[in-house]
UniProtKB/Swiss-Prot annotation:
Gene3D superfamilies for this protein: Spindle assembly abnormal protein 6, N-terminal domain
Coiled coil region boundaries: 166-471
Role of this protein: Central scaffolding component of the centrioles ensuring their 9-fold symmetry. Required for centrosome biogenesis and duplication: required both for mother-centriole-dependent centriole duplication and deuterosome-dependent centriole amplification in multiciliated cells. Not required for centriole formation in embryonic stem cells but necessary to maintain centriole architecture. Required for the recruitment of STIL to the procentriole and for STIL-mediated centriole amplification. Overexpression results in excess foci-bearing centriolar markers.
Name by which UniProt lists this protein: Spindle assembly abnormal protein 6 homolog
Subunit details: Nine homodimers form a cartwheel structure with an internal diameter of 23 nm and radial spokes connecting to the microtubule triplets. Forms a complex with CPAP and STIL. Interacts with FBXW5. Interacts with NUP62 and TUBG1 at the centrosome. Interacts with CENATAC; the interaction increases with CENATAC acetylation. Interacts with FZR1; the interaction is regulated by CENATAC and leads to SASS6 proteasomal degradation.
Domain writeup: The 35 nM long coiled-coil domain mediates homodimerization while the globular N-terminus links the dimers at an angle of 40 degrees to form the inner ring.
Phosphoserine: modified positions: 510, 615, 657
Domain of life, per lineage: Eukaryota
Organism per entry: Homo sapiens
Lineage of the organism: Eukaryota, Metazoa, Chordata, Craniata, Vertebrata
Length: 657
């Protein structure tokens, strides 16, 4: 039984007699063999072979007795069991140091003969240093005889055959896997082609879509740019006018100050004689001057904070301006819809005009606020300039006082006037701060007004949508009435007795039905509207509808509409239950003809445009609710002539048969 401890290539330095040293890589194997015949013992086998030369073979078998003699000869400090590991450590150090220019450990194979043939050789492990080469271990290796070489070659051949078999098996597996991968590759190529085609079509669609969106966005950006340029030019003109006014005021102020300066110089020359007497007062004046300087510094700080606040307010006003511009754009978009119904619904136009006026008023107020804020900032700048000028005047006066050391009574009065001016400027600054606070409150109020206008716009949008739905429903009812009238005129009419007709009509109302003023409730918009005669009589009296009077066959069907508004939470059941409505007959002579829409308004026009944006307060009871009844309805004697179509607004409700 053998245990392989080490088996790898090691760098080796070969030395032969009368030959140059050469470096080769030799495969070294270290095995620990256990022999139990006749006595159990362990032997250490060291073997050197060359992969390029199969006949190169050196062996060394070290038993425990041999190791003891070796230990005694070379002064080793390890036991037989620890010797293999220490020897392997030395070999690893030799391989690690081999790549260096000056290796610390060397592995040498020294032969006393000229050629490594059948002569023994010594394997030395040498440590090099600048002083001496120390040999840590020297082992004598014997060359292998023919039997050992044949045995070694047979083992190598056996290993190579086993390796060949394993490689053949791995080759077969690799070929199978290659075939499978080729098949999968072909399938994946097909899938890839499909995906490429789909991706190409998808990318083409996306490019077209994005190009269209890009053109739309470019147009919007150009419109916004033109609008912003106009606003910028207007603001620029206003600022130029304001700056010119400021320059004119400053020039006037400069002329006044120059005149005052001349007057002061004259007074200074007059008061040179009395300056020496006021040296005692000078110290007090200097202390007061320091105090005024501190006050001026505090005023500067407050002024800087006010500038920052003004800048923030300007930003906020700009944001409000952008919001107002967006609202104006939305109002313009809504104008296009309202223009379609301008002829029929004047009240909606008035509401829209009111909203536009409110928006314009808000914009004008914002412009005024911006102008006031700019004027306040200009006033603050003026105050800063005045303070700087006052400081310069004070410095010049102090220099003149130090040079002349005299101050006149008139100069004391001048200082008092300057202090009064400073106090006035402080008061002006306080007033400016209060006005800024007031303007902030006004801006907040304007913002609340803007929010209220936005809410009103949203409510008007919802109202327009509801009115559109109501108008479409009314158009549908008018078309149905026209169809019923045509069918009544074309079909053969029967004239039952008037008593039975009136009884039939009057008996069509059930006392338990949910009828509110003869109007159905529209479930989506919450607006009550009258039921057309065709709808009510088709659902309630499908077989008993007849004309009351046959003396007016050409008068046509007249429908009365009385638009009123109910609660928006009316259910569909109320609509279904309230479909039958009483139609009392008027016996008054003055109201002999039924009041309502004439037959010419019930004709369907091909060029008609559906009305949109019906307001809730469009029709009032005083203008559009009239006393009248339904005219003579000419119905066919055959009930099958009436088409039974489902309602567009009530999909689940079919006409009763």
């Amino acid at each position: 039984m053998s245990q392989v401890l080490f088996h790898q290539l090691v760098p080796l330095q070969v030395k032969c007699k009368d030959c140059e040293e050469r470096r080769v890589s030799i495969r070294m194997s270290i095995e620990l063999q256990s022999v139990s015949n006749p006595v159990h013992r362990k032997d250490l086998v060291i073997r050197l072979t060359d992969d390029t030369d199969p006949f190169f073979l050196y062996n060394l078998v070290i038993s425990e007795e041999d190791f003891q003699s070796l230990k005694f000869q070379q002064g080793l400090l390890v036991d037989f069991l620890a010797f293999p590991q220490k020897f392997i450590d030395l070999l690893q150090q030799c391989t690690q140091e081999h790549a260096k220019e000056i290796p610390r450990f060397l592995l040498q194979l020294v032969s006393p003969a000229a050629i490594l043939d059948n002569s023994p050789a010594f394997l030395n492990v040498v440590e090099t240093n600048p002083f001496k080469h120390l040999t840590h271990l020297s082992l004598k290796l014997l060359p292998g005889n023919d039997v050992e070489i044949k045995k070694f070659l047979a083992g190598c051949l056996k290993c190579s055959k086993e390796e060949k078999l394993s490689l053949m098996q791995s080759l077969d597996d690799a070929t199978k896997q290659l075939d499978f991968t080729r098949k999968t590759l072909a399938e994946k190529k097909q899938e890839l082609d499909k995906l490429r085609n789909e991706w190409a079509s998808h990318t083409a669609a996306l490019t077209n879509k994005h190009s269209q969106e890009l053109t739309n966005e470019k147009e919007k950006a150009l419109q916004a740019q033109v609008q912003y340029q106009q606003q910028h030019e207007q603001q620029k003109k206003d600022l130029e006018i304001l700056h010119q006014q400021n320059i004119h005021q400053l020039q006037n102020r400069l002329s006044e100050l120059e005149a005052a300066n001349k007057d002061l110089t004259e007074r200074k020359y007059k008061g040179d004689s009395t300056i020496r007497e006021l040296k005692a007062k000078l110290s007090g004046v200097e202390e007061e001057l320091q105090r005024t300087k501190q006050e001026v510094l505090s005023l500067r700080r407050e002024n800087s904070t006010l500038d920052v606040e003004c800048h923030e307010k300007e930003k906020h006003v700009n944001q409000l301006q952008t919001k107002v511009a967006v609202l104006e754009q939305e109002i313009k978009d809504k104008d296009q819809l309202v223009l379609r119904t301008k002829e029929a619904f004047d009240t909606i136009q008035e509401q829209k005009v009111v909203l536009e006026e409110n928006g314009e008023k808000n914009q004008v107020q914002l412009g005024k606020l911006e102008a006031t804020i700019k004027s306040l900032s200009a006033e603050l700048l003026k105050a800063n300039e005045i303070i700087k000028k006052l400081q310069g005047d004070l410095k010049t006066l102090m220099g003149k006082l130090k040079l002349k050391n005299t101050v006149t009574i008139q100069q004391e009065k001048l200082l008092a006037e300057k202090e009064e001016k400073l106090q006035k400027e402080q008061k002006e600054l306080q007033d400016v701060g209060q006005s800024l606070r007031i303007k902030e409150q006004e801006v907040c109020k304007l913002q609340e007004q803007l929010e209220a206008t936005v809410k009103k716009l949203e409510e008007s949008k919802q109202l327009l949508k509801n009115n559109e739905k109501l108008i479409t429903w009314l158009n549908k009812e008018l078309n149905e009435n026209q169809l019923v009238r045509k069918q009544d005129v074309l079909g053969p009419s029967t004239t039952p007795p008037a008593h039975s007709s009136s009884n039939t009509i009057r008996s069509g109302i059930s006392p338990n039905l949910n009828v509110v003023d003869g109007r159905l409730t529209y479930p989506t918009c919450g607006i009550g509207y009258p039921v057309s005669s065709a709808f009510a009589f088709q659902n309630t009296f499908p077989h008993s509808i007849s004309a009351k009077n046959t003396s007016h066959p050409g008068s046509g069907t007249k429908v009365q509409f009385n638009l009123q508004f109910t609660k928006p939470n009316a259910s569909l059941g109320d609509v279904q239950s309230g479909a039958t409505i009483s139609m009392p007959c008027s016996t008054d002579k003055e109201n002999g003809e039924n009041v309502g829409l004439e037959s010419k308004y019930l004709k369907k026009r091909e060029d008609s445009i559906p009305l949109r944006g019906l307001s809730q307060n469009l029709f009032s009871n005083s203008d559009h609710q009239r006393d009248g009844t339904l005219g003579a309805l000419h119905t066919s004697s055959k009930p099958t002539a009436l088409p039974s179509a489902s309602s567009a607004y009530f999909p689940g409700q079919l006409p009763n048969s």
